[in-house]
């Protein structure tokens, strides 16, 4: 079951990308993935890891790095879901990854595997996206190619969200004042409901 689920998540393709990653950088990536799963950090800092890769001459695109991060997060969360031992995990990966990478995975799983399995049992392992940050500001439209009525205030809302793999993305919304008031009203309603729980 464990191996089939990893195949369904596309881990085979991730394994080919992992082979070019130096063990020390791979260890940092694994550590951030595990911390994200344990809710100790809001996400994996893909940009900082990418810069580290570039600094040591590892030629990989940001998209390929995101695939590695998703793959490692999936590996650890799936291994926790099936409560696999370190030997079971390594026996499944031995034909797919180099020895140095397997040593990193062994170290990380020996250190954190038990805790991840406990979190999985209590359903506290990060299953989906998480709101990391929320910013808003009010502005005034003074020029536009598509808008005829200018000099109207608007609100820009930026939501930073970490997906299940820890990748942080920003979503920006521009709302009119009535739309923002409705948005605010809905958040107040949610807050009132949460206070009764």
Curated annotation (Swiss-Prot):
Keywords: Cytoplasm, Nucleus, Transcription, Transcription regulation, Ubl conjugation pathway
Annotated COMM domain residues: 130-197
Main localisation: nucleus
Localization in the cell: Nucleus; Cytoplasm
Molecular function GO labels: NF-kappaB binding
Any Gene Ontology biological process: signal transduction
Entry GO terms, CC: cytoplasm; nucleus
PROSITE patterns, per database record: COMM (PS51269)
A Pfam family this chain is assigned to: COMM_domain
The keyword Electron transport is assigned to this record: no
Subunit (UniProt): Component of the commander complex consisting of the CCC subcomplex and the retriever subcomplex. Component of the CCC subcomplex.
Role description: Scaffold protein in the commander complex that is essential for endosomal recycling of transmembrane cargos; the commander complex is composed of the CCC subcomplex and the retriever subcomplex. May modulate activity of cullin-RING E3 ubiquitin ligase (CRL) complexes. Down-regulates activation of NF-kappa-B. Inhibits TNF-induced NFKB1 activation.
UniProt family annotation: Belongs to the COMM domain-containing protein 6 family.
Protein name: COMM domain-containing protein 6
